[in-house]
Amino acid sequence: RFQEEHRYKKPVAIYWLQSAAVRLTGGDSASSIYRYRLVSVAAASAAVLVLASLGTYMFGVEAGLAAALMLLGIFGLGFEGRVAKTDATLLAATLVVQAALARLYLGARRGEATGRGWWWTFWIAMGVGLLVKGPITPLVTGLTVAGIAIVDKDRAWLRRLRPAAGIALALLIAAPWFVAITA
């Protein structure tokens, strides 16, 4: 609820995360706004670190550092990282999905064993993305997968995504919210 109005328009993750941040820092619902903003600060910081890791994996240390510094220098990230909104958290979740996708795809192309860790990371972050802002993370990821499939005709790497089980996991993560707003 916000000012006595139910807030079903936005998915619930940001509210849950902000409530946890307030509780973990010893506050209550009437606490100073900075406690609510901690989620955005943490998410913006995580996004920079994930991009550094992704860039390093794909192109080397210099590229990873350059990408992270560019993201860090973007005015929008600085702004979104200081407000109690969903965008920094959405960016972090989406970047985690993209990083896991890169590990799965490039791992297959390079003949690397990726294990199940990146699969779990991909689909859990997808579920979190659904809870943060609905279809945005799946849409971005779907476009990425489609782009790769157009460029790379060998689609054997898609088996690493195990989409049936993965979609079920992501929906299982998001299901409590979907059930709550329809009940």
Q: Where are the regions that the model predicts?
A:
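Membrane-integral, polyisoprenol-dependent glycosyltransferases
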Residues: 1-183
